[in-house]
Amino acid sequence: KNVLSDSCTFFSPYYRQISMDSWLSLDTALIEKRFQLAYKDVVAAFRYYWNNYNQGRPFILAGHSQGAKAVIELLKHEITPEIYQHLVASYAIGYTITQEELDSYPYLRMAKDSTDVGVIIGFNSVTKPEAISPLFKNNIVCINPLNWKTDASPGVSYQGFTASIDPSI
């Protein structure tokens, strides 16, 4: 059971993933080359979903880590104006989006609060700034999932956990 299953019809593609060794190499050319194989599977699955199952309904894209990269690439290269009008939001958790990407792709829009639609909800969780992967050094998209703010004000979960954003990193 997933977070969205009570309110959504859930579709999740099977796709080939690149190994952790590839990601840990920090070799962006190697990562990109290997990711393209996985991404072809994601594109085929999204197109099949759109053409056979969506039927004009609102939809959410969601992915974590490599899946978040796939979501970002779908937004860059597969989303058309017709498709975009049905997009509620894209959860791209655990990956990076640069300012250059935001400036270059019209469907990469950063969430600024809880009422935004057609936006990317993204963040990377770490216990301390030193733990941030070099792959995420230029990330610009971040919203606190506990309070839906993009500033440093802390959000508190119903379980008492506190999370805050450091806008300087």
Stretches with model-predicted labels:
Residues T28-A29, P58-A62, A89-A92:
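A generic short-segment signal for beta-strand/edge and adjacent turn/coil regions
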